[in-house]
């Protein structure tokens, strides 16, 4: 990671934390009142093929001790009413500002994968994770809705896993590697702006 990229991460994360603290506290209170504890969902993700970290999110689902893999249609009935709202505008990812400050992730980069997928596709993720993972990125912007459409019909964890591994992992990795070739501070700012614009409610 370049110094300019790290300074952008730190400056923007601190600014958003200060300005957005009332929103963060309000959302935490809303989850606590409507859905109970825990307010946060902590998930192990990988920042390099060898090093994991705990990714912070606001909880959007009812807890399930047997939960594994990515979210597909098989988990749709566990999403809370508050969770639907948070996911629609990606507000569930606001706690990741803490991960950015810690240096676990950047604002822009490939989404940090679960350990299970790094172990299933070691050669692929050895390339993808040469760059620091991020909250948003080219693959997130270009493929997220397609991924949701592909996984929504899945009715079991095994089916979700099969579709994700066969259809989503290689396509997202291809986009992540395109980003790696194009990355620059200006390109990161363009991707951040595109992410914000996409999440603004227009109706």
Predicted regions and their residues:
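A hydrophobic, helix-centered structural microdomain
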Residues: 1-64, 179-203
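Positions in alpha-helical segments
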Residues: 13, 41, 80-84, 116, ...
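Intrinsically disordered, low-complexity boundary segments flanking structured domains
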Residues: 25-29, 43-44, 122-130, 159-166
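Short, hydrophobic secondary-structure boundary micro-motifs
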Residues: 27, 41, 70, 108-110, ...
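A generic fold-level signal
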Residues: 35-38, 74, 100, 133, ...
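Short, glycine-rich, amphipathic interfacial segments at transmembrane boundaries or analogous
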Residues: 41-78, 139-170
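A short, structured surface patch at a secondary-structure boundary
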Residues: 74-138, 192
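C-terminal terminal-structure detector
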Residues: 130-203
